[in-house]
Regions:
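Glycine/serine-rich phosphate-binding loop and adjoining beta1-alpha1 elements at the start
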Residues: 1-32, 61, 172-174, 190-199
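NAD(P)-dependent Rossmann-like dehydrogenase/reductase catalytic/cofactor-binding core
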Residues: 2-6, 11-17, 233-350
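Rossmann-fold dinucleotide-binding core
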Residues: 121-213
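Active-site-proximal catalytic alpha-helix in oxidoreductases
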Residues: 178-233, 239-257
Length: 350
């Protein structure tokens, strides 16, 4: 593995130069890969593998929107598209990409489909790490592995199509065959990964759940709402409040961070912006650190897992979720956002 310096800490990373696609194809040439779940991660991973010459079939609940989507993407019922259990029975590698609650619900049936030497693949460590709540405990005579793309399912596919690829982490939980690592890396390359970062199932799920609830989604949404509400309270117009809270971040500043780091973003702004941001950043850091401490403890204790499974397993979960998302969409802030997005310069009629 190649060695990279991450802020003074040396880490090993697998590159597609040392593990090229042709090697992945050779390792997987006799395998049947069943992608179970054609919802979030399933489509991108399945389509990328199919385009890379891997023998892929889909397992999905019939008479569902995801089944119809798989058909639209070229998977043929009875040939490359089957009900979940039927697909699992045919496979040598089972990519278990149902939702976390879905994995728990289907597991009693799925475990009966596993044969000695099969590979059980996850893209999230949730079900394995919190097995005391999910009851997902694989038999000892199968490989249990993980490849977790560092992006949404949509990004897995779009980055593959534009040639950039996606970075992923990988882990081996159980190596019955003695070849689990090679198969895992082959699958990582086959789904479109450019770089593969070693991790463990536990580290992946702990960091992932913290990130989603924190900076990546939950914290971001909460902080945006707080600033927008403050500006509106003090008489700023909706468009001004949104532009100074969301639009300038997403359309300008975060791109500078992505390109060259936080210092580059600061250096690219006015001296007034620099001074204020540098002075206030530690105050925000200190204010939110206790919240992050609480969050991480709830993640590693399994409390967040309990909440997720109870909520997402409820029969009215989908209706409640749609109501929550509708409330966000219909709020003044995000209705303003829709208008602001329509007025971006690239949307002007020529």
């Amino acid at each position: 593995m190649a060695q990279f310096n991450f802020g003074g800490v040396m880490e090993e990373v697998i590159t597609d130069d040392e593990f090229p696609l042709q090697k992945a194809r050779e390792i997987l040439k006799d395998e049947i890969v069943a992608v179970l779940g054609y919802g979030v991660q399933g489509p991108g991973q399945a389509l990328n593998m199919r385009d890379n010459g891997i023998n892929v079939i889909i397992g999905q609940r019939e008479n569902s929107a995801s089944w119809d989507r798989a058909v639209a993407d070229g998977f043929v019922p009875g040939k490359t598209l089957f009900p979940v259990v039927e697909a699992a029975r045919q496979a040598t590698i089972i990519q278990y990409l149902l939702s976390d609650a879905g994995q728990m619900a289907v597991w009693p049936q799925l475990k009966e489909c596993l044969s000695e030497g099969n590979t059980l693949y996850f893209s999230h460590g949730f079900s394995i790490v919190f097995h005391d709540q999910t009851n997902v405990i694989p038999p000892q005579n199968v490989d249990v592995v993980l490849v977790a793309p560092k992006g949404s399912g949509r990004t897995v596919r779009s980055n593959f199509l534009d040639g950039s690829g996606i970075n992923s982490s990988f882990a081996i939980h159980q190596d019955y065959s003695g070849n689990a690592r090679e198969k895992t890396l082959a699958l990582g390359i086959a789904i479109g990964s450019g770089y593969l970062f070693p991790t463990t199932f536990a580290n992946e799920v702990h960091s992932d759940l913290t990130g989603e609830r924190g900076v990546l989604m939950g914290c971001l949404a909460g902080v945006m709402e707080a600033q927008y509400t403050l500006l509106r309270k003090h008489g700023h117009s909706p468009s001004e409040a949104f532009n100074e809270t969301v639009e300038e971040l997403t359309q300008s500043l975060i791109r500078l961070v992505a390109a060259n780091g936080m210092d580059w973003m600061f250096a690219s702004c006015s001296t007034t912006a620099q001074r204020g941001a540098l002075d206030w950043a530690p105050r925000f850091r200190d204010a939110v650190s206790p919240v992050f401490d609480e969050l991480y403890q709830k993640v590693i204790s399994g409390e967040e897992t309990k909440r997720v499974l109870e909520s997402n397993s409820a029969p009215d979960y989908r209706q409640k979720l749609e109501k929550e998302l509708a409330a966000i969409k219909e709020s003044e802030m995000w209705q303003t956002g829709a208008t602001v997005r329509s007025l971006r310069p690239e949307n002007r009629k020529k």
